[in-house]
Amino acid sequence: MEKKKAFIPLLYLASIVFLPWWISLSFNKSLESWVTNWWNTGQSENFLNDIQEKSIIKKVLELEELFLLDEMLKEYPETHLQKLRIAISKETIQLIKMHNEDRIHTILHFSTNIICFVILSGYSILGNEELVILNSWVQEFLYNLSDTIKAFSILLLTDLCIGFHSPHGWELMIGSVYKDFGFSHNDQIISSLVSTFPVILDTIFKYWIFRYLNRVSPSLVVIYHSLND
């Protein structure tokens, strides 16, 4: 009976780890055809207009060089110009297809992540008992560690997440999340998040040390500051 009680929280933990991957894969496959059909039938005419406008303007500017080249080659034979116009038309069609695929990808991934978040939230609420058991295990494990190990672990974790060498890791992680939601890479937004988010975390962590650890374990705070210095 005790083994069964211990097995259920472990099974719940494993399901939390693998459930997001399974949900994402399943809904991506099932929603792909529906989103593609919805987008291509014109029902999305007014959807994401601002984003589309910027994207299309950028692509049109890229094509301007080809049109300028067309003007420069007017002195060439008509057959040569005809081939050039055909090539430009094909390139334009290809850009439109790529634009549609990007928009479909954005909508699909954003919808999938929202659905995944809702399902996981409901799953966490329904599994509240298992979460309580897992939390008690974690607290017992941390309680049995010495203050030195705790301080070393906190220092290692903070240096990895909010240390002076962490921006590259944050850039990769935020870029990965940004891509997972289906948005195209944007250096300005990612740089802004990288420069602000770790600072916010660092402030919260220092406040936590000041308010919580000073009250619960003063010796741990002393060891932490000694290692940090």
From Swiss-Prot:
GO molecular function: antiporter activity; proton transmembrane transporter activity
Keyword Nuclease part of the UniProt annotation: no
GO process annotations (BP): potassium ion transport
GO CC annotation terms, alphabetical: chloroplast inner membrane
InterPro entries per the UniProt record, alphabetical: CemA
Pfam family, one: CemA
Subcellular location, record wording: Plastid, Chloroplast inner membrane
Task of the protein: Contributes to K(+)/H(+) antiport activity by supporting proton efflux to control proton extrusion and homeostasis in chloroplasts in a light-dependent manner to modulate photosynthesis. Prevents excessive induction of non-photochemical quenching (NPQ) under continuous-light conditions. Indirectly promotes efficient inorganic carbon uptake into chloroplasts.
Annotated protein name in UniProt: Potassium/proton antiporter CemA
Organism taxonomic ancestry: Eukaryota, Viridiplantae, Streptophyta, Embryophyta, Tracheophyta
